[in-house]
């Protein structure tokens, strides 16, 4: 099954986040969440974002969907070390088939993964101008190991579910949390960085079963990587280790052509509520750090019940991808 970055799926599909520590599902459309549920996953079913035990994943999903009476059409999210994200600049190409061929040709050189063992997708995220003054397309290309994707799909289909799209958790995270265009055009508040908000990148750091980082300008995710820090540990070492990984990620992102300066860091996921974590990180990386509204301003309308909203950020972003 292919990746479906930015592709439309049937309205009503459920965003399904297989976090590792838990599974979360959200159904949303028109800015409103209609259903949401989550359940703990047994230890060892998913490890470092990859399916370790297909049979137990299938049984867990059967139980979860039956108990919560959820629709069977789902949009999956993935995040692990078997995924590579790269930026390409290409000549301005209008024909879709020609663009796809050009992306694949350049991806073979840019991505250290045999493309015959990978699923590949891309998104055009804007335009640039070359040194000679000619227009160029800015493209984000994603490659994922096919064997890894197939294990997710096998586990999901075994539970009687119908996967209708596969997205990156990082893209879903940005989709759920990115500020609206109107907010992005607002001037900076007193004491904030002087650059216009729309010219700054935002770092999103999701502290779930997998710690995931994304850098975005507006709603365009330009860089992503899973982090190794275990936020569930206590003490100052967590903030210190996480700050170092965030710093290194920002440095790597800033080395890319056309990178925008980072203006802030937004934390999400269950780990984002750890006491004083945002303040400690801000002091260590010298950037504003805040805990994001976990559902990005979506109308919940009582759909969460007693659920922890911080579990549902990625699933909500996946659901928004299905409903857009």
Give each language-model segment a name.
Residues 1-324:
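Hydrophobic/aromatic-enriched cytosolic interaction surfaces used to assemble or bind macromolecules
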């Amino acid at each position: 099954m292919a990746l479906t970055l930015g592709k439309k799926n049937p309205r009503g599909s459920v965003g399904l986040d297989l976090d590792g520590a838990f599974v979360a599902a959200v159904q949303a459309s028109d800015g409103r969440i209609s259903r949401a549920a989550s359940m703990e996953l047994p230890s060892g079913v998913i490890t470092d974002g990859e399916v370790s035990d297909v049979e137990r994943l299938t049984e867990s999903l059967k139980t979860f969907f039956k108990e919560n009476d959820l629709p069977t059409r789902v949009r999956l999210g993935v995040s692990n070390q078997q995924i590579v994200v790269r930026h390409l600049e290409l000549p301005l190409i209008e024909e879709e088939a020609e663009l796809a061929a050009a992306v694949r040709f350049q991806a073979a050189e840019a991505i250290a993964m045999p493309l015959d063992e990978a699923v590949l997708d891309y998104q055009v995220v804007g335009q640039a101008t070359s040194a000679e003054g000619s227009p160029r397309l800015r493209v984000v290309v994603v490659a994922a190991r096919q064997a890894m994707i197939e294990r997710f799909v096998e586990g999901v289909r075994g539970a009687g579910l119908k996967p209708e799209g596969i997205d990156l958790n990082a893209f879903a995270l940005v989709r759920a949390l990115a500020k609206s265009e109107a907010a992005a055009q607002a001037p900076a508040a007193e004491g904030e960085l002087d650059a216009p908000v729309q010219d700054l990148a935002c770092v999103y750091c999701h502290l779930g079963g997998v710690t995931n980082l994304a850098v975005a300008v507006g709603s365009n995710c330009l860089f992503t990587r899973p982090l190794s820090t275990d936020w569930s540990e206590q003490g100052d070492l967590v903030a210190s280790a996480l700050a170092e990984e965030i710093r290194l990620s920002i440095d790597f992102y800033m080395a890319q052509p056309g990178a925008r300066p980072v203006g802030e860091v937004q934390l999400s996921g269950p780990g984002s509520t750890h006491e004083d974590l945002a303040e400690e990180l801000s002091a260590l990386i010298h950037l504003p750090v805040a805990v994001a509204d976990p559902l990005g301003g979506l109308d919940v309308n009582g759909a969460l019940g007693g659920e922890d909203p911080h579990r549902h950020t990625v699933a909500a972003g996946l659901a928004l991808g299905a409903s857009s």
